[in-house]
Amino acid sequence: ITKDDFVLEIGPGIGTMTQYLAEAAREVAAVEIDKTLLPILDDTLKDWDNVTVINNDILKVDIRQLALEKNQGLPIKVVATKYIYVSPA
């Protein structure tokens, strides 16, 4: 991940890895389904102005549209932790 990259993080949890991504990337969109984690994420990421937290199910996010808006439609980097739970469609 470089300063030129737009990164989509699936399931940031409390934002620990998100901080490292924000340091390395141009911009990070972190999609978190659990709204109870939003206050923690807001606090953890308050010093990072290149992070957008999206409270949604990743299966409901239009990733193509996000890439178009945030990265001119160019390929994006996707990061997720191995313990992520993706709800069935």
Where on the chain are the PLM-derived regions?
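Catalytic cores of RNA-modifying enzymes
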Residues: 1-89
